[in-house]
Amino acid sequence: MIFRSMREAIVTMLAALTTMFCALAIDPESGPAILAVVLCLSLSRSQLDRDLRGRLEAAITLPAVSVASLGVAMLLLHAPWIGAVVFVASMSLSIWLRRFGQLVRRAGSLIALPFVVILTTPYVPTTRISHTMALLLPIIVALLALLWVTVFHLLARRLRWLPQARVLSEVVVSPPRSSSLRPIASTRMAIQMAVALTVAFVVGYVYFSERWAWIVLTTYIVGSGNQGRLDVAYKSVLRILGAGVGTFFALMFTVHARPHDTTTIGWILASVFIGIWLRPLSYAWWALFVTLALALLQGFEGPSAQQVLSLRLEEIVIGAIIGVAAAWLVLPVRSTGVLRLRIADSLAMLANALDPATALRRPEDFLLALDRVERVAPAFRASRLLTGRFRTAHPADWVDALIDCRQHAISLIENGETPGEVRKAIGAARKAMREPEEILRALQNLHRSMTSHV
């Protein structure tokens, strides 16, 4: 995984650098260049460039996001409270859109990163191009980002540097149930984000004056990608640790370098690359290096390095507390519920792959669903380390039991086998998702049935 993520990081950075140089050729100011890099990172992570339909949607969404982010940046500078309202609404909308399927969810994910960067990089009007070109430039940069991300990814896949794009098949496990009293998870997470960001802006504007940005930034990062309240608490710890280390290194570097000189720009780009590369290993790495990049981009102002570091850490801790409080107190999403749903999705994919009636059986869909299970596993494994001695069974054990089935499942699918005993065990495991006490035993039985047929 480490080598694949490194290759993806290299391809993403090549696209980002090419787009950045194109933007600088049009306007030497730093604003469009920063926007170019951010849009490339967002597009690469959304994977909308992987197919024609996604590229068409990105061609519409990216320019809109680009223009909107600059508009919000202007509002935050000249009308802070109005800018805060628009920022909160936009971020919450990007989460609420998850309810409309995979493609819309990926398009909504484009909103986040450009809006995050404007928190630490204030809008500066361009002075080197005409007013008309300044209005068109965000759209031009967005389309350049789409062009170069698509070109580099297509070339990398053609050269077999990256694997062919895979899209998870839509298999309906059980329709989400919603009511006016208990909305579905995406709606609850959107409400949580709206409440958290609103509190962060109010606390920042009222009590911290010019220091509000990092409070809002941390609140968003802790709550983004919410996979349940345990996940938010886990990420808040990683965010504080990673951001603290990142801020420390950024501060030490700026003591010996001038803000925004060539060396600083090189370190910013290197930090972004390493953050993309190591993100699949742990969120802590992403938190560390994205904080380092943003801190170098923003620079430091203060009477002493020690005071700047303590103030920045104070802002990060306050933002993390707000994010965790919203996740646990405002329409909380149970982490075990998220995990059970993702395990059920994986079992549905496995059942489909081992169904004799399925014309084309392949392991990719099951593996992609299993990847989604593994994304929520770190928080549960950390919880198991702390509470393992007090519990005989832990949800992290469910993940381990399912992962133990991976190689056996691949062998059965690739060999075209559909043993009845295994299919029966899969059915029993899917039924056990309704009874947490039975899940571990059912998954262990599934593993034993697979072992006897491989």
What are these regions (language model features)?
Residues 1-273, 277-288, 301-312, 329-338, ...:
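Alpha-helical transmembrane segments and their membrane-interface boundaries
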Residues 322:
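Conserved catalytic alpha/beta cores of large enzymes that bind or transform nucleotide phosphates
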Residues 223-226, 296-300, 376, 380:
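A short secondary-structure junction motif
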Residues 281, 297-304, 354, 433, ...:
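Conserved NTP-handling cores and scaffolds of large molecular machines
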